[in-house]
Amino acid sequence: MGAQLSTLGHVVLSPVWFLYSLLMKLFRCSTPAITLESPDIKYSLRLIDREIISHDTRRFRFALPSPQHILGLPVGQHIYLSARIDGNLVIRPYTPVSSDDDKGFVDLVIKVYFKDTHPKFPAGGKMSQYLESMQIGDTIEFRGPNGLLVYQGKGKFAIRPDKKSNPVIKTVKSVGMIAGGTGITPMLQVIRAIMKDPDDHTVCHLLFANQTEKDILLRPELEELRNEHSARFKLWYTLDRAPEAWDYSQGFVNEEMIRDHLPPPEEEPLVLMCGPPPMIQYACLPNLDRVGHPKERCFAF
């Protein structure tokens, strides 16, 4: 009788255990592993691909620890790359252009500042030239997440005044964005997060400044998003040196551009900025003030 009960128990428990094991595997698969577990730890990631986007712009793809890993970077945050270059530790911030939903890899689009191309910076960019010199299989150290802003979805932003302060929550219906050059990467990160959620009705207005038309980073990605989400994403360019047949603005960011292409102050939008410090200090902030956007609703990455 005992043997029969033992056999019966085995017959009953085996399917239950099988189902339990299957559910546990599915649960583990649905919760991807996070690479950036602590902002205080450096993670060595391997270069697995390089794409030439233009004469001075590259897309670098780095492998995460496993095909099941995501980077684990909240929307609005950035990472730091660090490397020993000519005997000195060089650290630079970057915002990935890949989605944090992407498993197994992270993409960075970086403009390479070559030496002897800009008279004010004859040595060029240390980190960007180092990345350009990397071979497939080489590694570099990532650290993060870092930053004072996190987009939590549905128009809600958590913004810390400084690293030691608790975040202040700002909920908006529209977001104004002013980007200059490589400052487009954090904007694209936020725009993608908003557009991929059909229940997020936040409207994004992007004013993107560059020197020439060929300098416009990530233009195909931006225009694809605009075409797919025309009601929620408004895109406008301005160039320092525009071609003759140019449908957008020409010149530095000014009061008129902000009035025409960013949401009005009456909507109480949040205005995000990212670009060269002189652009933020002399073009963005004074003209935003003239239009009527209060400082507490403006944030510079």
From Swiss-Prot:
It is found in: Endoplasmic reticulum membrane; Mitochondrion outer membrane. Keywords: Acetylation, Cholesterol biosynthesis, Cholesterol metabolism, Endoplasmic reticulum, FAD, Flavoprotein, Lipid biosynthesis, Lipid metabolism, Lipoprotein, Membrane, Mitochondrion, Mitochondrion outer membrane, Myristate, NAD, Oxidoreductase, Phosphoprotein, Steroid biosynthesis, Steroid metabolism, Sterol biosynthesis, Sterol metabolism. Its cofactor is FAD. A lipid is attached at residue 2 (N-myristoyl glycine). GO terms for biological process: cholesterol biosynthetic process. Disulfide bonds: none annotated. It is a lipid-anchor. Component of a complex composed of cytochrome b5, NADH-cytochrome b5 reductase (CYB5R3) and MTARC2. Interacts with MTLN; the interaction is required to maintain cellular lipid composition and leads to stimulation of mitochondrial respiratory complex I activity. Catalyzes the reduction of two molecules of cytochrome b5 using NADH as the electron donor. Belongs to the flavoprotein pyridine nucleotide cytochrome reductase family. This is NADH-cytochrome b5 reductase 3. It comes from Macaca fascicularis (Crab-eating macaque). The gene is CYB5R3.
